[in-house]
Amino acid sequence: IERYADQGRCVAHIDGRVVFVRFALPDELVRVELDEPHDRDDRFWTGEVVEVLEPSEDRVTPAWPLAGPLAMGGGVGGADLVHVSLPGQLKWKAITVSEQMSRLGHIDVAVPIERMPGDKAAGGLNWRTRIEMIADDNGMPSMRRRGTHNRVAIDTMPLATRTLLDVAKREHVWEGGFEPGSQIRLSVPEPRGEIVDTAAADDNYAVLVDGELRAGSQLLTEQVTINGTTFDYQVDANGFWQVHRQAPIALGTHVINLVNGQLQSAADAVIWDL
């Protein structure tokens, strides 16, 4: 395996042809099963690790095995770097962004990547404030196996915040009873601010089935504290909001600090809101 690529894949070559390999790491020696169909006229192939012969020091046992390689009992997707240690994940992202800045933008720059507060202690889990699933033929919440329409029933979602998991348990989501094929969405604002409170979400959550509210509230209250100022937002349960529990704080704080830095030495300024 030669180098990092996109979508949690790495680059290798077979008979001179590029192969994008899932669940690999640079400098590893692995056995790969190629995705079908493929033929020798293809510009590149894709495949997945089925055996690791010489592992990288950044390789770990997947914390969520169901999202790991299919040959190792996984295959549902949703956690592309589940086989990579937390420091290795930061290295992967920093190198990938730096390479793209150089290749596409012709800018050579170091890209610092930092974890949000609480991420390390949680082992990289429990950060999603929204999850989406599909009901299988038995009405159980499930996820599709990667690259197929096959549905794999799940009884938890390790990437979801603990607050969301508490709501899912309280609303009996994991017990099933859904119409087969229905789309299930949980939106649970994580209490935000300088100190994150993991208390119960009261009715500030939504369980939606095929876009219709089943439990909670259609309008959710999101709260973000930036540099000591708290902002409240009303967001539709079907609407967009940053998925990571700390992303709005990090993004908002960074932008405000950049703007303040420009304004401090300027008589006037134009700020573009994209």
Identify the residue ranges that each predicted region occupies.
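Accessory RNA-recognition modules of RNA-modification enzymes
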Residues: 1-274
